[in-house]
Amino acid sequence: MRIKIDQDSNTPAFQQLVDQIHFLINTHELKTGERMPSIRRLAEECGLAANTVAKAMRQLEFRGLVQALDRSGFIVTGSDAGAGRYQARGVSSDKTEVHSVVEKLDHGLFANAFCKITEDFLTGNPDQCNVMHADGCGTKSIIAYLYYKETGDVSVFQGISQDSIVMNLDDLLCVGMKGRIIISNIINRNALNCPGEIVAALIEGSENFIRSLREVGVNIYSGGGETADVGDSTGTIVVDSCAVSVMKKKHVITGDLIQPGLAIVGLSSTGRANYETAENSGIGSNGLTSARHDLLSRYYAEKYPESFDPNVSENLVYCGPYRLEDPLPESSLTVGEAILSPTRTYAPIIYRLLEQFPGLIKGLVHCSGGAQTKCLKFGENLHFIKDNLFPPPAVFKAIQQVSNTEWKEMYKVFNMGHRMEVYTEPDQADVVIDVAGSFNVDARVVGRTENSDTGNRLSLVHGTEIFEYGP
């Protein structure tokens, strides 16, 4: 192996070793299945202590790039184009460790529902139930921060308010919520880096978006919020929201009707719905850590060190070729416009389906965390087959091309073209497609459900490849 350790570098020797082996694996100079030199041999070749090499190998093993065979032997398991790349940035697409804890808690009245639903503790009505939900825009606010710092345009944060609200609203849609919703926003900022005008833009954006939702029939109202100055916790800004509502138990979409024999209708995440003000890239609010680092250039790491986790390996930080103002390939948008595109809500479409076609919807899945594999959490002994997906939108193609991320992993991190799935009888699929079309949102039958003898699993067709997820 061609490894050279610079003893005069400010980068620790173990990190230099990690970065160089990482590069050799990514460029396939070290191939999957190839046995690595022993720790002792690497230490001798690099002039390092054995414990320094061992520390580097543990880091590579954590990233999923190598696997220990014995006390000192390792085998290459693949490039970080798989799950290792996302995990190495401190992010989990499926939040396995979180779900392992939540599984032990009370699941509420309807254990298979998309959101936790409780008895009506607010009003005490036995025929009603409460739904409370919390979510946010994730690290998308950091991209807005970069854009603001580069341009001085504070209005970019208005879209961030929409992202945070939609991530709550569209989860609530999946349990059939169409009543009155109160939403509260939480802003955690580094006040030295994020002045008051950013907070003002976020609040204004929230109020404007809530007002626009009411104009299209969504009964959502502002419940105020909280702004905290927590510079020790964040170098930039974090935007989250919490929604609460009351609904009748008989109207809940419980998830129990997601069974074999259904059509899966995907609602496109791209284009421009007639209730949107601009073209949507489809990016949503998931996978933005990877999108930001894989697309944007080292320029942002050097100029804005407060915008990334210093614990992440240097070669995974802002390692892309683009600046925010650069054109996105195969798109009319710039890179900045594409990754800041506000998350689309499907509320007007779902509301109309619920009101005009009662019983048509058997289940709804918001393809947020876990993306196209989110469906695996719902139903029992189901084989989800997705063999007619939308072509990957330009923003996701660009991310894959610059990062060399495996397509199988892309479908676990990004929505890849549709962010809402409607599960319905096959002969009702055209109704869903027509209703979506009336809002200028593309829809298509992306797949179906069949019986499975081995628990829930997903077969996803990408070009000539078939990706398998689940047991």
PLM features: what roles do these ranges have?
Residues 1-36, 41, 83, 93:
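Extreme N-terminal segment that seeds HTH/winged-HTH DNA-binding domains in transcriptional regulators
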Residues 35-67:
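N-terminal helix-turn-helix
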Residues 18, 54, 166:
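Conserved catalytic core of two-component sensor histidine kinases
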Residues 36, 68-80:
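Short, Lys/Arg-rich nucleic-acid/phosphate-binding segment
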Residues 29, 64, 176:
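Conserved functional loop/turn residues at catalytic and ligand-binding sites
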Residues 22-23, 58, 170:
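Core alpha-helical elements of the protein kinase catalytic domain
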Residues 84-471:
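Helix-biased detector of long, well-ordered alpha-helical tracts
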